[in-house]
């Protein structure tokens, strides 16, 4: 396996396919780099260098007890970018991974970054607060943490329904995808899985938005039952100067799978533009 030993000894697993302008993919919760395989194959075949990593505590990366916060995740990305000496890199983050790449720019700047893509991302703020009334209530995330602690496998199996939107008429996702999703999710440590619920629900990225100074694409489904568009993608577009918004009508959270061809085409057009 290809890994990077981080500053605290954590082993960060990553895939590195193809050659050309680099695109670095940051995965969603509670998945791994494998969620990006279709995108990586697509871009590597078209002359790009596609890189995806397993966030600490997830997939094949090691499982530390602490460090499941966005400052740490951003610093992990910085180490990977430095290690691989990536320049003119396109950063793409899905769901909680959108927070990773956003915080990277806020903490480390955009000198090595060409563009940013936020797909079904939790930015700028996921949870409802006094000054952000459109997000899900804290009780929703309390329930997620409780469900994970009680029976993680069953909770995640059930969660896949709204993740892929298969409770909607006409939705079609194979049993193989459901099985793969659960298999990937259960590779993560329970501690990381639970702690990241707090990180992705409570981290306020609104101050980070003003620091994004590269062309940005926001992709979001308007029927996202996990990370509601009105609470996240819509506001991210409004807060990131000059960003481009692509709203997928009727699309669920997992657009990289359910709307793979459109995501790939939109990303390619954005990267080439």
Language-model regions, residue ranges each:
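Conserved HGGG/HGGXW glycine-rich cap/lid loop of the alpha/beta-hydrolase fold
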Residues: 6-66
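Conserved acidic catalytic loop of the alpha/beta-hydrolase fold
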Residues: 72-89
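Flexible "cap/lid" loop of the alpha/beta hydrolase fold
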Residues: 102-150
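Catalytic active-site module of serine/aspartate enzymes centered on a nucleophile-bearing elbow/loop
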Residues: 241-273
């Amino acid at each position: 396996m290809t890994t990077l030993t981080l500053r605290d000894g954590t082993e960060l697993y990553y895939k590195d396919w193809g050659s050309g302008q680099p695109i670095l993919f940051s995965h969603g919760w509670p998945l791994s780099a494998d969620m990006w395989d279709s995108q990586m194959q697509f871009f590597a075949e078209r002359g790009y260098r596609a890189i995806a990593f397993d966030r600490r505590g997830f997939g094949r990366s090691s499982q530390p007890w602490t460090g499941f916060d966005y400052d740490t995740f951003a610093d992990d990305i910085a180490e990977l970018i430095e290690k691989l000496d990536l320049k003119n890199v396109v950063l793409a983050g899905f769901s909680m991974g959108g927070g990773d790449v956003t915080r990277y720019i806020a903490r480390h700047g955009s000198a090595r970054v060409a563009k940013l893509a936020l797909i079904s991302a939790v930015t700028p703020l996921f949870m409802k607060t006094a000054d952000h009334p459109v997000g899900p209530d804290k009780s929703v995330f309390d329930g997620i943490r409780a469900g994970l602690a009680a029976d993680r496998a069953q909770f995640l199996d059930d969660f896949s329904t709204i993740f892929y939107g298969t409770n909607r008429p006409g939705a079609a996702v194979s049993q193989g995808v459901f099985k793969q999703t659960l298999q990937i999710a259960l590779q993560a440590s329970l501690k990381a899985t639970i702690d990241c619920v707090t990180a992705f629900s409570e981290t306020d990225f609104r101050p980070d938005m003003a620091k994004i100074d590269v062309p940005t694409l926001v992709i979001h489904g308007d029927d996202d039952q996990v990370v509601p568009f009105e609470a996240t993608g819509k506001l991210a577009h409004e807060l990131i100067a000059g960003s481009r918004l692509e709203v997928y009508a009727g699309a669920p959270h997992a657009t990289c799978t359910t709307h793979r061809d459109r995501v790939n085409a939109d990303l390619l057009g954005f990267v080439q533009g």
